[in-house]
Every structure is written in structure tokens, then in C-alpha cells.
């Protein structure tokens, strides 16, 4: 089997004792093929949702934005993607993969830890909420072995960050703190 076949092998079973993110599920549910399929479908669906509603906002959003992106030569008046937007797309897409992972082990924290400050500050959440989310994620990955509570805290923190990223500004609406924001939305 090739990489793609093995990467999406729904018959593979992960060891329940090592999971950090889904320890709040009973083991039979954790190892079920239905759970694996739901997580994979959720991952694909949320990526599509972000593509259609958040990431291609400056290109017109929706399927029109996808069409513009897929064209061989974008029109001269097509707005360029900013470096901020590119980094945000990459970090958010990685985070979506983390949220919908069938299992996260302790070493996976290093896979996305360095993106958390950027992601947290890309949300409209208050400072105290950002710091609480960061502390909750840090706590969850420092409990060994993972417990139902630490896993639930991680899921709650991921959910709050995810919602903050979704309701936050789309490309072309980047939050800024200065009076001269151009087309960007100002922080309240």
C-alpha cells in the first residue's frame, strides 16, 4: 500500500492507553470504525467550510473563490494573498487536523505548539480567554497518563480556539490596532 492508502486506513486501530485527546470516550467507541469515519468526515467538512467561507473571502468566497483559485492565470485585478493570510491558512488547516485527529499522543504537541500563539492572536477572543486556552492545552499535555478530565479540558480548549478562529476575521478583514486600517476591521 502507498502513503495515501495507509494514511487513511480506517481499519487501523490505535491504542487507547496512549490517547491524549479522546480519553473521555469509552474504549469501544474510541476504537470503532464509526468514530474514525466521523472524524475523517468532520475533518474534510470543516476544511471545506473554511475554504469556502473564510480562506477565499478576498477572492469572492464560495465556489466562485474556488474557481478563481483553480484558474491557470488569475485575473490581473485579483487580490493577492497576503503573507499573514498564507500563514494563517497553513496553521489553521494544521490545527483542524489536530482537532479531528483519531488520536493525539504526547509527542504530537510539538507538532502544533509553536503555532498556538499565532492562532490565539488571530481570534477576536479577549486576552484572558487566549491565555486560559493556552494554559488548558499545556495542562492537558502535561498530565500523564491522560485522564477523562485532562482529555475533556483539551477538547474544550480546542473547541474554543476553533470557534474563535471561525468567527474571527476572514482575509481582507484582518484585525488591527491602528487608526489607519484601510479595509481591515479595527479592534473594539
Region roles according to the model:
Residues 1-13, 33-188:
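Multi-pass membrane glycosyltransferase architecture that uses lipid-linked
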Residues 13-34:
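Juxtamembrane membrane-water interface segments that cap and precede transmembrane helices
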Amino acid at each position: 500500500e502507498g502513503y495515501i492508502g495507509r494514511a487513511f486506513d480506517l481499519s487501523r486501530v490505535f491504542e487507547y492507553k496512549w490517547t491524549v485527546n479522546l480519553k473521555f470516550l469509552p474504549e469501544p467507541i474510541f476504537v470503532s470504525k464509526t468514530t474514525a469515519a466521523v472524524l475523517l468526515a468532520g475533518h474534510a467538512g470543516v476544511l471545506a467550510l473554511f475554504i469556502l467561507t473564510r480562506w477565499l473571502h478576498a477572492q469572492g468566497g464560495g465556489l466562485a473563490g474556488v474557481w478563481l483559485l483553480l484558474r491557470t492565470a488569475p485575473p490581473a485585478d485579483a487580490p493577492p494573498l497576503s503573507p499573514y493570510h498564507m500563514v494563517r491558512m497553513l496553521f489553521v488547516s494544521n490545527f483542524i487536523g489536530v482537532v479531528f485527529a483519531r488520536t493525539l499522543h504526547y509527542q504530537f504537541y510539538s507538532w502544533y505548539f509553536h503555532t498556538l500563539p499565532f492562532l490565539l492572536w488571530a481570534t477576536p477572543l479577549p486576552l484572558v480567554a487566549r491565555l486560559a486556552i493556552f494554559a488548558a492545552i499545556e495542562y492537558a499535555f502535561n498530565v500523564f497518563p491522560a485522564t477523562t478530565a485532562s482529555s475533556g479540558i483539551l477538547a474544550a480548549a480546542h473547541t474554543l480556539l476553533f470557534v474563535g478562529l471561525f468567527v474571527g476575521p476572514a482575509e481582507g478583514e484582518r484585525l488591527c490596532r491602528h487608526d489607519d486600517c484601510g479595509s481591515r476591521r479595527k479592534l473594539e
